[in-house]
Amino acid sequence: RDAQESRGLGDVYKRQDSDSVAAMSSKTVTRKRAYLTFDDGPSDQTGEILDILKEHNVKATFFVIGRNERYYPMYKRIVEEGHTLAIHSYSHEYSTIYASYDNFVNDVEELRKLLYDVTGVDCRYYRFPGGSSNRVTQVPVNDLIDYLDSAGLTYFDWNALNNDAVIAGQTPDQLVKNILKDALNYDDTIILMHDLDCCHETVESLPSLIEQLEEHGYEILPIDDDTPHIQHRTH
């Protein structure tokens, strides 16, 4: 008690200041980041997606496929406008690419070479068709992950999605709600959407999604080397 009573006001202020600094510090280190990702493009609506992103000064990540030559110029626009171009699949034919290890490797390498030839970018990020937790692959997923590691590729899954390619007929508002019910649980959220002609509601939902994420304090970023590795399957 004597020691407590002998403490001066200076000690109290020091403790309060220290507590305040600690509280402020703890607030400043909590950085909320959202990553908008689009699978399966380019498509006829990729240009509209890029226009909306530009209007909102937001960068995203496009996990693209390679089967449609008329969309190849869109790869260049994605890169030129500062977005991350990433590998999804050349063919996107699950029954083929997951039938054997060699098929998987050939599919990845074919698209990686194509993207380099068209854009000059050596893409270093990958998303498994169906995600790394897919139940289609005939090859152990860890073997495929070992290949990606050896090829200098980092794979990303997601922890929020709008279900645009799963449930038809959803409104743009419903798509946003689907995302936020999961995304708001995380400081770092990777959001799965699709760049497909059948998913135009996703395009319509984008302005509202961007605004609501920003209202909740998220910084919207493209995937890069600093992005947390949100992965469904790990070694």
Mark where each language-model region is:
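A structure-centric signal for secondary-structure junctions around beta-strands
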Residues: 9, 31-32, 187
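Catalytic domains of cell-wall/extracellular-matrix polysaccharide-remodeling enzymes
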Residues: 70, 92-192, 196-214, 218-219, ...
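Gly/Ser/Thr-rich beta-alpha loop segments that engage phosphate groups in nucleotides
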Residues: 10, 43, 68, 132-133
